[in-house]
């Protein structure tokens, strides 16, 4: 099995971003959603990105943002990729002409294969836990058996992942990447560096990376 990629999401501090990179994370996620306790503003995001070494992917997470709001952020912050975590349509996601990930909140009866096909321009599909009225960051895992095999897009597994369960998640789902936020925190938006290291070690152990 090839090495599973990883993103540490909900970064709000420079020191947490650097800890994620030092532990081996491929990407960091910055949340531009004011209702989230992990949200950052433009100045915070710029400072975090400026502190990063080369070859670390920066992902901006948006939830049903207005076109004006999103364009203002894109003009001010050098993001590598967008993550749409709301009800954005394929056309809306495509309209920004940036590489993007589309998040789906998984519940029983969902046709994940059809959603992958609908968002054909996405670089990957992120699968998260469905909780009514909550767009993400619930800290709860979902039933991984709901994910069908042979999906047409790289799958990024999220939703309640921790250092203790990510190994089992990788073994069962065999995703392209894993995404964690609350599972490596000591408080909302404040990362626990030892948990980040433990999470990344579990990812390496499970994916066979050297």
Swiss-Prot record:
Keywords: Amino-acid biosynthesis, Aromatic amino acid biosynthesis, Isomerase, Tryptophan biosynthesis
Gene Ontology MF annotations: phosphoribosylanthranilate isomerase activity
Catalytic activity reported: N-(5-phospho-beta-D-ribosyl)anthranilate = 1-(2-carboxyphenylamino)-1-deoxy-D-ribulose 5-phosphate
Enzyme class per UniProt: isomerase
Pathway per the UniProt entry: Amino-acid biosynthesis; L-tryptophan biosynthesis; L-tryptophan from chorismate: step 3/5
Annotated EC: 5.3.1.24
A GO BP entry: L-tryptophan biosynthetic process
Superkingdom of this protein's organism: Bacteria
Similarity annotation: Belongs to the TrpF family.
Protein's recorded name: N-(5'-phosphoribosyl)anthranilate isomerase
Underlying gene: trpF
